[in-house]
């Protein structure tokens, strides 16, 4: 009987300790989770061309040129493609589109749409995001596009190939972005209908505002 009582008392003590330590453990876990989230962000700079990058990074002209060249190649691979110049101009504005050779990855039915000219139309690269130039290593880069058509949701903004906005189309800025923002985007395999890219930008902007609102609400409740 005495042994049984001792076991019960021990269980009670363990239960009491667990109940009182759990909030502390949760608090510590939350701190580490927040730290992990902060570390998931990456500081990037927005440039219009290699010269802008070189001016901001003295002695790194070669790295800046390479990053710009890679961004241009990435833009050709991932930018929205249009079957006609008119469709592209309607989205991005006059003087903001260029022809690009038909890609092997584009579906045959879409290649047929551009058979008359033998090429597709895509927006010019308006700028690019570049990660920090760490000693010796090459920085990541991501091409950015911008519309000059006031009717487009992408008007005056920097957007990536997926339609995600990174604010006003003003080079020289530095900002924090999720590391996923710098990940390579999938190659464009189909042509976009007129206004299609703008719809993607509008949807992405709505999602970003919703996420920002949820974060602010959570912080207010936590604070």
Curated annotation (Swiss-Prot):
The family this protein is said to belong to: Belongs to the UPF0441 family.
Protein name: UPF0441 protein KPN78578_33850
InterPro entries: Biofilm_formation_YgiB
Low complexity bias spans: 177-193, 209-223
UniProt superkingdom: Bacteria
Region (Disordered) residue spans: 165-223
UniProt cross-references to HAMAP family, sorted A to Z: UPF0441 (MF_01188)
């Amino acid at each position: 009987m005495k042994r049984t009582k001792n076991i019960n008392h021990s269980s009670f003590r363990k239960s009491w300790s667990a109940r009182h330590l759990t909030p502390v453990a949760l608090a510590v876990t939350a701190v580490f989770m927040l730290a992990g989230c902060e570390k998931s962000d990456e500081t990037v700079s927005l440039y219009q061309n290699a010269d802008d990058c070189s001016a901001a990074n003295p002695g790194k002209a070669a790295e800046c040129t390479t990053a710009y060249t890679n961004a241009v190649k990435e833009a050709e691979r991932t930018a929205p493609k249009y079957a006609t110049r008119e469709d592209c101009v309607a989205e991005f504005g006059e003087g903001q589109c260029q022809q690009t050779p038909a890609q092997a990855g584009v579906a045959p039915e879409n290649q047929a749409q551009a058979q008359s000219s033998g090429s597709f139309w895509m927006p010019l690269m308006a700028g690019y995001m570049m990660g920090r130039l760490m000693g010796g290593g090459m920085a990541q880069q991501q091409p950015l596009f911008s519309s000059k058509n006031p009717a487009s949701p992408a008007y005056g903004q920097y957007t990536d190939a997926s339609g995600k906005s990174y604010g006003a189309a003003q080079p020289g800025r530095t900002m924090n972005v999720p590391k996923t923002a710098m990940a390579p985007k999938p190659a464009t395999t189909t042509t976009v209908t007129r206004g299609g890219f703008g719809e993607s930008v509008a949807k992405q902007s709505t999602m970003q505002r919703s996420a920002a609102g949820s974060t602010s609400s959570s912080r207010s409740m936590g604070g």
